[in-house]
Each structure stands twice: as C-alpha cells, then as structure tokens.
C-alpha cells in the first residue's frame, strides 16, 4: 500500500484505489443468487457492506451482539431498498456459547451460505477477560471468528458444491497487524495483564486474522474446495471501534487527516473481495485499497500460522 496512492486515491492494478467506494467496486454486479453473513453489520464498515450487498440483491444475515441495533440496521436498509432481503441473528463473538448458538439459529434457516464477512471487532480495550477466560480483543477478533468460520465450513462447502458458485470468506484485518508483540503472537501470555498492551493486543488479534486466513486458504486448496479466503485492511476510518482510544488518537487523526477515509470508501475493499468477479480463485492474499499488497513477515510465516491454528483448535475444544 503506497502512501502516494492513499493520498491521491489513484487506482491500482485492479482499477480501484483508496477513493473508491463500496458502490463503485460492486457496480453492475448482480448478487441475487448469493447469501452472506456479515458479523458486526450494525455500524461503520459492516453496516455499509450490508447495505451495498443488500442493494446488489444478496440475502444478508446481520450477525450482531446488539439485536436492537441489528433490527434498526435492517429497517434502515429496507427503507432504502424495500426489496432487500435482510435477516438478523444474535451473535456475541466474545462468547463461545453464543457462537455455537448462532450456528444453530443460522442452520435452522435452511439457506445456503456463499459469503462470510468476518467484520466485527473491538479495539484498544482495557485489559479484560471474556466469559471464557480469554483476553477480550483476542477472544472477539480472532477466537470467535475462528470458531464461527470452522463451524460454517460444512455449509459453505455444500453450498459451493451444489451451486457451483465459489464461496468467499473475508477476514477484516488491519495494517495494525504490523504493530504487535515481539514474538508476533504471545501464546504463553495472552491472558497476562502484566504483559498487556492495548495497542499491541489489537495488533496481535489482527495478525491472527491474517494467519487464520493464510492457514485456512492452504487447507482448502489441499482439499480442492471451491472456497477462497482473503484478508483486508479497510484503511483509516473513524468508526465505533475508536470508542476506547484517547487524546493521542485524536491528535494523530488531526495530523494525518489526508490519509483517512469515509465509511463508503472504508467498506470498498471488503465488498470488492467479497463480490468482484476478477477475484475468482484468488485466495490467501492481503488486500488494501482494493489491491493485493504485502503484509508483515509474521503474517506470511507458515510455521506461525500452523502454530496459531493448533493453539486455537485446542482452545475452543477445551471450552464447553
């Protein structure tokens, strides 16, 4: 991701750039044959992605901890597009129990699943353990989505097989994945308050999203499954994620105002990777400004990715 492109909005090889919006990158795409789950689809990038996918005809399931906010989002989209197909299901990604409950609710709908957008997240939170005893940013941003994705894979595989339509998983990562702990993932001390850094813990969780994508991409390719998984950096956007940030972030934003995007621009890369036909068979990549870019060395470390995969499997299997 080049600074020049970020500032000027100049399009990259894909034909899109930092100034492109979610509507721009999905122009003329007909998604009526697709069903998508979007986690955290009640505000910011998630809501914009839900709106645009709904506008393009996809059946959108908004998965959110706050059911009122989800229903309000649904009503807003329906007011704009009365024929949109929007459903809402409750999902708290910080809770293993809630993730498993969501799976039961979704499977009961008896619909296919073509697109999974793992968008929800928390950022820069004070140290706190989830109800399962996992540091909250790691629990919500990685473990919850890791389990959700694994439990939805059979449905995605059968949908891809029966329809012939490529399934797509989009993990919302961040350039913040480059700012993590010295060892990348602090496996032995994830729940240690004495070693906790709000910003590094966030970076660790975003690195985990990338490692998860890359490990699962390799596994799906080995199986010969018609499903891709990619990671995206949305850009610098002011959303509800910043509710835990302080004065320092306000100063940073004031000094770098020319790099920040609005929400329609911030949702562009997510929607591009989820829907654009040019990305057929593209998997295991990291996108920013709707173009493939290079992540950190940690992010492409297959040994680290496999270690995180095994760690995550053991962790979720140890919980009821």
From Swiss-Prot:
Disulfide bonds: none annotated. Coiled coil: none annotated. Keywords: Calmodulin-binding, Chloroplast, Membrane, NADP, Oxidoreductase, Plastid, Plastid inner membrane, Protein transport, Transport. The active site is at residue 196. GO terms for biological process: protein transport. Substrate binds at residue 174. NADP(+) binds at residues 40-46, 92-93, 119, 140. Transmembrane segments: none annotated. Its main location: plastid. SUPFAM superfamilies: NAD(P)-binding Rossmann-fold domains. Expressed in the dehiscence zone of developing pods. The keyword Membrane applies. Residues 301-317 are annotated as: Interaction with calmodulin. GO terms for molecular function: calmodulin binding; oxidoreductase activity. CDD domains: retinol-DH_like_SDR_c_like. GO terms for cellular component: chloroplast inner membrane. Its EC number is 1.1.1.-. It is found in: Plastid, Chloroplast inner membrane. Involved in protein precursor import into chloroplasts. Maybe involved in pod abscission or dehiscence (pod shatter). Belongs to the short-chain dehydrogenases/reductases (SDR) family. Part of the Tic complex. This is Short-chain dehydrogenase TIC 32 A, chloroplastic. The lineage of its organism: Eukaryota, Viridiplantae, Streptophyta, Embryophyta, Tracheophyta.
């Amino acid at each position: 991701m080049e600074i020049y492109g970020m500032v000027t909005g100049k399009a990259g090889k894909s034909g899109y750039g930092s100034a492109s919006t979610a509507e721009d990158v999905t122009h003329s795409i007909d998604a009526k044959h697709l069903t998508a789950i979007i986690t955290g689809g009640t505000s910011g990038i998630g809501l914009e992605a839900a709106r645009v996918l709904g506008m393009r005809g996809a059946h959108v399931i908004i998965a959110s901890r706050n059911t009122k906010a989800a229903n309000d989002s649904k009503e807003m989209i329906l007011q704009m597009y009365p024929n949109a197909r929007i459903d809402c299901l409750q999902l708290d990604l910080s809770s293993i129990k809630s993730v498993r409950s969501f799976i039961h609710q979704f499977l009961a709908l008896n619909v296919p699943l073509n697109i999974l957008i793992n968008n929800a997240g928390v950022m820069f939170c004070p140290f706190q353990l989830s109800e399962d005893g996992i540091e909250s940013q790691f629990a919500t941003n990685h473990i919850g989505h890791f389990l959700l994705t694994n439990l939805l894979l059979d449905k995605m595989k059968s949908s891809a097989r029966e329809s012939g339509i490529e399934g797509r998983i989009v993990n919302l990562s961040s350039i913040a994945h480059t700012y993590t702990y010295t060892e990348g993932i602090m496996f032995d001390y994830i729940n240690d308050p004495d070693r906790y850094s709000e910003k590094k813990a966030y970076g660790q969780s975003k690195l985990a999203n990338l490692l998860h994508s890359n490990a699962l991409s390799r596994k799906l390719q080995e199986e010969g499954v018609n499903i891709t998984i990619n990671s995206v950096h949305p850009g610098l956007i002011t959303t509800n994620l910043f509710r835990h940030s302080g004065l320092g972030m306000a100063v940073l934003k004031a000094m770098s105002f020319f790099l920040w995007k609005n929400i329609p621009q911030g949702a562009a890369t997510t929607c591009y990777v989820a829907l654009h036909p040019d990305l057929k068979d593209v998997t295991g990549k990291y996108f920013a400004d709707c173009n493939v870019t290079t992540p950190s060395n940690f992010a492409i470390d297959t040994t680290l990715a496999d270690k995180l995969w095994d760690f995550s499997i053991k962790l979720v299997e140890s919980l009821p």
